[in-house]
Amino acid sequence: MSDTPKLNQRPEWTALADHAKGTLPHPDLRELFAQDPGRAERYVVRVGDLRIDYSKHLVTDETLALLQELAAATGVSGLRDAMFRGERINITEDRAVLHTALRAPRDAVIEVDGENVVPQVHAVLDKMAGFADRVRSGEWTGHTGRRIRNVVNIGIGGSDLGPAMAYEALRAFTDRSLTLRFVSNVDGADLHEAVRDLDPAETLFIIASKTFTTIETITNATSARSWLLDGLGGDEKAVAKHFVALSTNAEKVADFGIDTANMFEFWDWVGGRYSFDSAIGLSLMIAIGPDRFREMLDGFRIVDEHFRNAEAPANAPLLLGLLGVWYGDFLGAQSHAVLPYSHYLSKFTAYLQQLDMESNGKSVDREGNPVQWQTGPVVWGTPGTNGQHAYYQLIHQGTKLIPADFIGFARPVDELSEELKAQHDLLMANFFAQTQALAFGKTPDEVRAEGVPEELVPHKTFRGNHPTTTVLAAELTPSVLGQLIALYEHKVFVQGAIWNIDSFDQWGVELGKVLAKRVEPALTEGADVPGLDPSTAALVAAYRELKEVH
């Protein structure tokens, strides 16, 4: 039995709890800035192209020092180094965690079980690049000899969210002669809408499933195969020219009709939610080209090296992870908003939902004991300025503490017209105004000074002290996207290390899958399913009745 004290019994934890209740019970950002004129410049971290301003957080130098002591006591740096060394830190699956190897330079040496995996990584990247170039140039043609103009990625979870998010983020860098679509939902409507206006002769499907057995993905892939064959006269040979696989199961890939020469591998030391810079990113590489894809990998690597080498408090992922622990475990926050002021980042928060909530949505520690502290928050948000006309009301004047990240860029993408570029200043005016309003609010006296009737003063008062991080970069490029993703990857790692949970398994997704296999015969064949609870049994019966209504 370990002699290591539980997290909430550590003196560093107790010191933070005392600090939250005693020294800093009601932090006021107006006072903190007034007391420290240099706060705005001191509370900034720079990494790569990112300027990260954390001055509007409910912390003091003492808070930050105590948080850093907690990180040291919980062995964050040791676990970080073990991850980079390729040790099996995913303890429940006995796996290494080496998504960082996916963006390592060719001359790096990163070993798993004594074998350098970097040559394998670059062999797959080179194979991807060769294939992507053939599709982009028109050298790769479909069964009828026509060039590919449509690419449909079929996957789910990490095999979908990552490439779909990155494609939207980097649309300005894509080949606009190519149409990319992403299918993940086993709801047949998803595939139907994705292909309904496409020409099968010009469509390539990328099937992303490591085992080639993922039920949602293979169901959609089989339906896509039927759609293709229906459109091309039923010739089975067409499959090999219109389907490629991201998988390691050569036998099942071949059985499907895919040429295993067009199978792109990845490894069990890459978790799904960390995988889109592996072969899972093939659709993105086709869209933006191999050179841009490698620029994105360079961006990942910038933050990887920063996380590995920068000392606190200048280590950005460590800092952001500690701030999350501060709010969740000591100030009672239950959620975290990520608010990108870029239309191109419309799927970024959804991507972070999987990254964060699947990683740290755990209630037992690494030893299997129930945790006695808060773990991962609910992550949510949409691009600005849309959210301002929806849920910002609750953030400003509601009863919940919701830390928020604001992500913005100084320049719009080049391909916009001059008139549309001019709108960017309006977008960013809102970006800066919201963080100011959230931090400093509007006092009753300030409201009264505007001549507001006394009975309306409480309604128009903003208490402020809503914490935000501002992440600012010159523009959204492939490298900057890689930097942003790696920043959040390592932030999530830091929090999992402090909470002593395994951030790299996801057993919570399994039970529903198992039960779905048992329930399906009741829906399709009317079979009895033993063990259904009364509520679910009644719902299944109602479903069957409704199916028969026309």
UniProtKB/Swiss-Prot annotation:
Stored Gene3D superfamilies: 1.10.1390.10, Glucose-6-phosphate isomerase like protein, domain 1
Gene Ontology biological process: gluconeogenesis; glucose 6-phosphate metabolic process; glycolytic process
UniProt name for this protein: Glucose-6-phosphate isomerase 1
InterPro entries xrefs: G6P_Isomerase (IPR001672), G6P_Isomerase_C (IPR023096), Phosphoglucose_isomerase_CS (IPR018189), SIS_dom_sf (IPR046348), SIS_PGI_1 (IPR035476), SIS_PGI_2 (IPR035482)
GO cellular component annotations of the record: cytosol
Substrates-to-products reaction catalysed: alpha-D-glucose 6-phosphate = beta-D-fructose 6-phosphate
Molecular functions per Gene Ontology: carbohydrate derivative binding; glucose-6-phosphate isomerase activity; monosaccharide binding
Entry EC no(s): 5.3.1.9
Function: Catalyzes the reversible isomerization of glucose-6-phosphate to fructose-6-phosphate.
Pathway of action: Carbohydrate biosynthesis; gluconeogenesis; Carbohydrate degradation; glycolysis; D-glyceraldehyde 3-phosphate and glycerone phosphate from D-glucose: step 2/4
Cellular localization per UniProt: Cytoplasm
